[in-house]
Curated annotation (Swiss-Prot):
Pfam families: Complex1_30kDa. Belongs to the complex I 30 kDa subunit family. The keyword Manganese does not apply. Disulfide bonds: none annotated. It catalyses: a quinone + NADH + 5 H(+)(in) = a quinol + NAD(+) + 4 H(+)(out). The keyword Ribosomal protein does not apply. Its main location: membrane. It is found in: Cell inner membrane. NDH-1 is composed of 14 different subunits. Subunits NuoB, C, D, E, F, and G constitute the peripheral sector of the complex. GO terms for cellular component: plasma membrane. This is NADH-quinone oxidoreductase subunit C. GO terms for molecular function: NADH dehydrogenase (ubiquinone) activity; NADH:ubiquinone reductase (non-electrogenic) activity; quinone binding.
Amino acid sequence: MADMAENNRAVIKLREKFASSILEVKEFRGEVTVIVRKEDIVALCKFLKEELRYNLLTDVTAVDYLGKDPRFMVVYNIYSIPNKDRLRIKAPVTEGECTIDTVCGVWTTANWLEREAYDLMGIIFKNHPDLRRIMMTDDWVGHPLRKDYPLQGPDREPYKGRLS
């Protein structure tokens, strides 16, 4: 199945233009994922949109791999409507920096999607036009989808019910 990923048109074009940026290419159940260096995310996404016609950013999210380095992975799910092709781009982000450049200048839909990843996971999207909480209140402490966030919430006693 690795052949499917390696023969993917987008992967071939990305390897031609961004060879040093690509860390890994994977295929799982017919879906291709390209893991890239975070430093090149804007140029790479711009190329995907302008040259390869991936004109729809369907989601931006983050995954917390607590205990691993890098701890976070920022995930971009994109789709080419003209080519009827889906692609996933991932960029590792270390816990110490916890930053990546915004892709709002590439896809305007990134605005609220990046705000959600910031609010719930604490990923800072540099140069974002309006990076502030979107779901939690402004005075909320922490980022509730991180794996080290207390299950019972901040400033609350652990649950003493059936699970204790």
